[in-house]
Regions:
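Hydrophobic beta-strand residues in large extracellular and virion-surface proteins
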Residues: 10, 15-17, 27-29, 36-38, ...
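Intrinsically disordered, low-complexity regulatory segments enriched in Ser/Thr/Pro
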Residues: 35-79
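Serine/threonine-rich low-complexity intrinsically disordered regions
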Residues: 2-3, 19, 41, 58, ...
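N-terminal non-globular leader segments, chiefly Sec-dependent signal peptides
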Residues: 7, 68-104
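Negatively charged, low-complexity tracts enriched in Asp/Glu with abundant Ser/Thr
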Residues: 1-32, 101-104
């Protein structure tokens, strides 16, 4: 599927598309405070790095610190509550499903 078709499907599925100065070659995809950066790949758009929690103009990946799950970006920490983890998992699942769709 062409990148523009993937972006259209993401938009129609309720994802917000944005640009970020820190990632000029990527398209930011947001929903429910989750974010991923997409870049062109050999088979269409692909996720750059991890998906994570939006923290300012960047992404806080889910990590474990001192026995608890948190989202971290630079010195900032956001608690990874069970609700936030479920939201992130749903975001990742829905995003990957659309990116992996083949044109029928």
């Amino acid at each position: 599927m062409l990148p523009e078709e993937q972006l259209q499907r993401l938009y129609l599925a309720g994802f917000e598309l944005a640009t970020f100065d820190r990632f000029p070659k990527a398209v930011g995809v947001l929903r429910d405070n989750c974010v991923a950066f997409l870049v062109p790949g050999p088979d269409g758009l692909q996720i750059l790095g991890n998906v994570g929690w939006r923290m300012g103009e960047s992404l806080g990946p889910l990590v474990e610190r001192q026995g608890r799950k948190v989202f971290v970006h630079k010195g900032e920490i956001v608690e990874a509550t069970p609700e936030r983890i479920l939201t992130l998992e749903r975001f990742r699942r829905d995003l990957k499903a659309i990116l992996n769709e083949r044109k029928s």
